[in-house]
């Protein structure tokens, strides 16, 4: 699920998923409005051009990487999400609904310094340009698992078809993967 903390698929560790991403989406990347601080690669020439993280305005831990990415984009650099790489962020609290006072203050600072930041992030989330790459990895994962895949194409009229397919999927849970259209 996009923008959520997700458990690893059964039978897959980070190394196995990373290999699958590398095989499925080699060399692919999409532009993003911001990086994710726990896992960012910054070129030295970009750092020299844009400057260091603004610890004065943000402190350490919240918002400084977002500010850096916004400054980099304004200076003509690209922020890229590599689609051939998988990194797991375990134990983070970034996905929790409630934000700490430090996180809230960092967001206010970002809004003040980069008024278009939230709009750009929400537009990126709405378009989700990495979705097809994730779906391709999911298909590759299913193929690799050897588990049968069932696609049920259903009509939207009344009757017992939907119920029957739901019962069948429940009965075969663990033995087959069901998708419905």
PLM regions and their residue ranges:
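Short, glycine/serine-rich, charged loops/turns that create anion-binding
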Residues: 57, 86, 156-158
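Short-chain dehydrogenase/reductase
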Residues: 59-62, 162
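Short, hydrophobic alpha-helix immediately C-terminal to the catalytic nucleophile
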Residues: 66-73, 166, 170
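Negatively charged linear elements and acidic catalytic determinants
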Residues: 109-120
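N-terminal subdomain of nucleotide-sugar transferases
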Residues: 135-181
């Amino acid at each position: 699920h996009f923008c959520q903390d997700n458990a690893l698929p059964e039978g897959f560790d980070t190394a196995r998923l990373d290999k699958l991403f590398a095989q499925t989406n080699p060399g692919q990347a999409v532009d993003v409005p911001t990086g994710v601080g726990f896992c960012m690669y910054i070129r030295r020439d970009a750092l020299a051009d844009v400057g260091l993280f603004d610890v004065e305005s943000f402190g350490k831990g919240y918002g400084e990487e977002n500010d850096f990415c916004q400054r980099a984009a304004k200076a003509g650099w690209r922020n890229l999400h590599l689609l051939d790489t998988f990194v797991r962020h375990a134990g983070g609290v970034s996905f929790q609904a409630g934000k700490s006072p430090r996180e809230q203050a960092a967001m206010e600072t970002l809004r003040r310094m980069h008024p278009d930041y939230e709009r750009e992030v929400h537009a990126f989330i709405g378009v989700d340009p990495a979705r097809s790459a994730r779906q391709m990895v999911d298909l590759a994962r299913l193929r690799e698992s050897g588990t049968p895949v069932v696609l049920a194409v259903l009509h939207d009229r009344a009757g017992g078809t939907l119920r029957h397919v739901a019962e069948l999927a429940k009965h075969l849970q663990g033995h087959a993967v069901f998708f419905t259209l």
